């Protein structure tokens, strides 16, 4: 089961701590992942603190605790805990949020589940910092689509797909969709707006991606033009040559392109933004890229296996 706020930024909260100082989550936790503990006794919280205080911020809700490396969050009415953990709890729990304060995991405080936190924290480790002198203006976010939804999308694609086409203007200036294997080669499925799968994808993007677009770029009030599942198969030599996603009158209202990886058991592939660098962008499975539809980009060939991807265009309202 996907925990509440998985892939979403936790809501902000403000408290006055035991020393009379104001603590604001979004303002004061400024680096690294966070473990949020609800319902634990001091000894239980202390064990978690010893294991993780060097790798994560640790917040404990409820009574004041004397544990090194733990910030106690006063919550006498249980309102903050209810907002973050979504309702009643029968046993103490711990939730892990990444450095962007988006939820990654939630497990019981006691028992084998805590071992999962070590693996989850290890997965959040970043590569060594680098000085960058050229980079495309692209947002890369993990955890946009959960594993169950990704599997459903791939299954739907395998049941119904067709050769991808390119939007053009013909000699008379009339819009047309044509196959151009020298420019684009892949298989596509357009999701049916009437099906629950479409609604589930729309909800995931609204809850997990749109707040980040607003935070980073002040992008708001866009609608999904359509959702597509596409495959790039190594055996077919699939690719999509460099192009822009809003270069025709019919696509001029597109603003943001979204590309979400549905699997990671392939080699090669990814996107290149040649106006800025030769770097190849590839999100983890379930994660994706968001970028302006005006950016020139190309989908490079997969060298082994098959890459499945969810594609979307966010456009201005009709």
Residue map of PLM features:
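Chalcogenol-based redox active-site neighborhoods
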Residues: 1-125
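Structural recognition of the beta-strand scaffold that forms the well-ordered cores
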Residues: 60, 289-290
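Fe(II)/2-oxoglutarate oxygenase catalytic core
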Residues: 88, 99, 110-288, 294-318
């Amino acid at each position: 089961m996907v925990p509440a706020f998985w892939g979403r930024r936790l809501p902000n909260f403000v408290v006055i701590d035991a020393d009379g100082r104001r603590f604001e989550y979004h303002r004061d936790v400024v680096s690294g992942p966070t473990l949020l503990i609800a319902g634990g006794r001091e000894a239980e919280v202390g064990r978690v603190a010893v294991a993780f205080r060097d790798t994560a911020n640790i917040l404990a809700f409820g009574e004041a605790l004397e544990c090194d490396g733990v910030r106690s969050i006063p919550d006498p009415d249980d309102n903050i805990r209810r907002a973050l953990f979504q309702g009643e709890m029968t046993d103490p729990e711990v939730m892990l949020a990444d450095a962007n304060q988006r939820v990654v995991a939630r497990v019981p405080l006691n028992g084998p589940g805590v071992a999962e936190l070590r693996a989850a924290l290890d997965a959040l480790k970043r590569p060594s910092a680098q000085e960058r002198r050229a980079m495309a203006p692209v947002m890369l976010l993990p955890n946009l689509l959960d594993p169950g939804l990704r599997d459903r999308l791939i299954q739907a694609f395998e049941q119904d797909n067709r050769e991808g086409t390119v939007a053009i203007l013909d000699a008379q200036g009339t819009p047309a969709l044509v196959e151009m294997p020298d420019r684009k080669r892949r298989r596509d499925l357009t999701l049916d707006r009437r099906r629950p799968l479409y609604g589930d994808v729309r909800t995931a993007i609204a809850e997990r991606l749109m707040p980040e677009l607003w935070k980073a770029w002040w992008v708001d009030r866009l609608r999904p033009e359509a959702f597509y599942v596409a495959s790039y198969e190594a055996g077919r030599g699939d690719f999509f040559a460099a192009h822009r996603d809003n270069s025709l009158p019919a696509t001029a209202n597109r603003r943001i392109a979204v590309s979400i990886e549905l699997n990671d058991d392939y080699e090669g592939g990814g996107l290149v933004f040649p106006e800025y660098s030769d770097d190849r962008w590839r999100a983890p499975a379930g994660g994706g890229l968001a970028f302006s539809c005006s950016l020139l980009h190309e989908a490079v060939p997969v060298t082994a296996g098959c890459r499945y991807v969810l594609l979307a265009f966010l456009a201005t309202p009709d």
